[in-house]
Amino acid sequence: ANVKLMVGFTLRFVPHYVQAREIIQSGKLGKIVSVYSRRMNVITQADRLGGRIGVLHFLGIHDFDLLHWLLGVEPDQVYSAESTSVEKRHPQENETFNTFKFKDGTLVCAHIGWNLTTAHPGGRDFKLTVIGDKGSLDIDLASQGLLMYSEFGSKFPSTAPGLDVEDKAFIDCVLDDKPVPATGEDGITALKMVLAAIDSIDKDAPVKII
């Protein structure tokens, strides 16, 4: 069918992450050594979904795609583990650390969970740290936003919220017959990462992403 398919990977359109990708790909951070991402929601988010889906399918898939998109390199393997110190309110995974090795050797740790209490002032905690051999970059969506430290100096780029950017991008692709920025293949890669992470939790062992 002659239709446009665009996967709703919203993080690709958040200005902070768009700037982060531009900085990474410009080489200002040098060769990327490691990346840490954190995406946390309050526990009531899990209650709202009532066990119909786990945190990796709900939140993790967005961060996994973000990491793949930022680095522009294919993931190779993952070792994932979930916390079992507190009895879960739902059967699916709800607090995980996922360590990926990408095919260029970059090490990535993604902390994905929804165990923040309702006392948390923001109800969510989203962070990203990128370490390169010539500089580093930090994103904290609860505070300053995006910070960069490198031989080019320290910068605090101006950012603004923009979820509408995603909708506009898709409309433009349809009207102007342009390639979509998040393809079905991108969706398949992110889903493979999620399924491998869940498999790793079940096996308590590293799993290749095929």
How should these model regions be labeled?
Residues V3-M6, L11-H90, D204:
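Predominantly a Rossmann-like dinucleotide-binding segment in NAD(P)-dependent oxidoreductases
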Residues P15, L59-H62, V165-E166, E185, ...:
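A generic structural signal for residues located within well-ordered alpha-helices
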Residues I32, V78-Y79, D140, P181-T183, ...:
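Short, hydrophobic secondary-structure boundary micro-motifs
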Residues F64-Q144, K168-V180:
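Contiguous beta-strand/loop segments that form the cofactor/metal-binding neighborhood of enzyme cores
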Residues K103, D172-I210:
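C-terminal helix-rich "cap/oligomerization" subdomain common to oxidoreductases
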Residues L107, S136, G153-K155, P206:
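Short, mixed charged/polar active-site loops
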Residues A119-R124, M148-G153, P157:
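A short, polar/proline- and glycine-enriched secondary-structure boundary/capping micro-motif
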Residues F156-K168:
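Active-site loop of classical SDR/Rossmann-like NAD(P)-dependent oxidoreductases
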